[in-house]
Amino acid sequence: MILVSAKQAESAAVQARLTTEQLKQDHQLANMDMIMRLYEFANSAEVQAAWLTVLTARISSYEDFQKLPKSDQVAFYQIGALFESLGVLVEREIVTVQIVEDMFLTQLAWESMKPFVAGVRQRFGEEESYAAFERLHERILTK
């Protein structure tokens, strides 16, 4: 009887270990899937067009941003939202800062977007606008 109980306990321990390993693998696959979807989104024609607009606009102030056509202004909001989302994912440890750094040009995005972010914060009185994007930028700088 004791031998049977010991075997049952051993089997339960093996099952628990295997289940834990399976859950870890499922979590890794889900994260990898999310990262690939983000990357696919970031490489869509719409986002790439927005990225090109932000890079070529070369704004040096919020006033420069306001002079842009509305479609170009929307590009800044799109890229800002993308990097804000990436910052939140890093802060919540859903993706690592290393993955974001490997896959996206965060520093270039921040430098191109800084006048826009400062202007949005001032205009709307909301210091938290694009805060996760800024923290992501700072985290990469201090790595």
Region roles according to the model:
Residues 69-143:
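An amphipathic alpha-helical interaction surface
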Residues 60-63, 107-108:
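Intrinsically disordered cytosolic tails
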Residues 1-60, 70:
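Membrane-proximal alpha-helical anchors
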Residues 39-41, 62, 77, 130:
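Sequence-level detector for tyrosine residue identity
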Residues 66:
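Short glycine/proline- and acidic residue-enriched helix-loop micro-motifs
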